[in-house]
Amino acid sequence: MKIKDAINRVRWKYKEKIDDYVIVIKDKLTETGLKEIPFTDIYTVDNNYLYLKGEDTIIPLHRVLMIRRKSDDALIWKRGD
């Protein structure tokens, strides 16, 4: 499944519990090299980028590594699967 499709699936299928989901991206500015973005921060997604609400932040989809559910640490989508 493409990352765009996985993001949209979570956004629409689990919208009542959307605050339980995060996207993990590569981030060179953090110690771990990873950063979690809550699904509640997502404005929209297209074929190339993830756009966040209320900011001018645009994240290239090639930086997205996984989608994770926080409540049980379940892996919803992972790059390469």
Swiss-Prot record:
Pfam families: MJ1316
InterPro entries named among the record's database cross-references: MJ1316, UPF0248
Membership in a protein family: Belongs to the UPF0248 family.
Protein name: UPF0248 protein SSO2687
UniProt organism field: Saccharolobus solfataricus (strain ATCC 35092 / DSM 1617 / JCM 11322 / P2)
Organism placement in taxonomy: Archaea, Thermoproteota, Thermoprotei, Sulfolobales, Sulfolobaceae
